[in-house]
From Swiss-Prot:
One of its GO terms (molecular function) is NADH:ubiquinone reductase (non-electrogenic) activity. The gene is nuoK. It holds the Pfam family Oxidored_q2. The keyword Membrane applies. Disulfide bonds: none annotated. It is an enzyme of class 7 (translocase). Belongs to the complex I subunit 4L family. GO terms for biological process: ATP synthesis coupled electron transport. NDH-1 is composed of 13 different subunits. Subunits NuoA, H, J, K, L, M, N constitute the membrane sector of the complex. It comes from Shigella sonnei (strain Ss046). This is NADH-quinone oxidoreductase subunit K.
Length: 100
């Protein structure tokens, strides 16, 4: 069995990597990938904690996180396609530019 600390450290590292990708990158696709990594890291923390205490609540939260990630991915990819269709690039800064 993997110790609780190792699983939580791995989840924290993954969360920080996802947060870094979300903050640093300006491409919408890479921002969505960073957000997915963050959601999966939090789901991993739930599973590790639930396994440590012998409860199934962590697995239930994992299923909830996966369904949330699927909904987020479908909406995010729809926005990504519309942005690419209208602006011909995926730079998130081009969305904030207003036409005058």
């Amino acid at each position: 069995m993997i110790p609780l600390q190792h699983g939580l450290i791995l989840a924290a590292i993954l969360f920080i990597l996802g947060l870094t990708g979300l903050v640093i990158r300006r491409n919408l696709l890479f921002m969505l990938i960073g957000l997915e990594i963050m959601i999966n890291a939090s789901a991993l923390a739930f599973v590790v904690a639930g396994s440590y205490w012998g409860q199934t609540d962590g697995q239930v939260m994992y299923i909830l996180a996966i369904s949330l990630a699927a909904a987020e991915a479908s909406i995010g990819l729809a926005l990504l396609l519309q942005l690419h269709r209208r602006r011909q690039n995926l730079n998130i800064d081009s969305v904030s530019e207003m036409r005058g």
